[in-house]
Amino acid sequence: MKRTLSILLTIAMIISLIPAVFAADVPTMSTTVDKTEVQPGDTITLTLSIDKTITNLNNWEWAIYFDKTAYVKTSGELEPGCMSGTGTTGAVGDNVDILGKNAIRVSGLSTTGDPVTLNAGKIATVTFTATENITAENARIEVKTEALPDYDTLKDNDVK
């Protein structure tokens, strides 16, 4: 009985390691903010980064969701050198409605059809100013992967 249990536990342990082995090549997206508490009128800066270079993309996009009664986007820019390839272009956009939610798109693409490389490190910086309507209930900012072919399992991030 002990031997059977030992074999089953060993098999279970090996099976549980399989996703980690295959996920080792998947890049990790991270978001950081420069403040942990925000009051009306405060400015916060959100930085979006990835830990591994991603090659052979036609396009990529993250969406930063936030309550527009709580924050106003005051600036946003892609990090110089975050993309490489022939005919690449990208931007940190203005407010858009995505399926009924307010968001800002951070995106890039190839205008020539040549592959785009998204380089490891800082991708974009976005600055927000908290409005007088900010509360604990509406202060959440959420970053989601909207378009990143072959990496649809990339973990999304919440900034609270």
Residues covered by each model-derived region:
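Positively charged n-region of N-terminal signal peptides that target proteins for export
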Residues: 1-9
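Acidic, low-complexity intrinsically disordered segments
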Residues: 14, 18-160
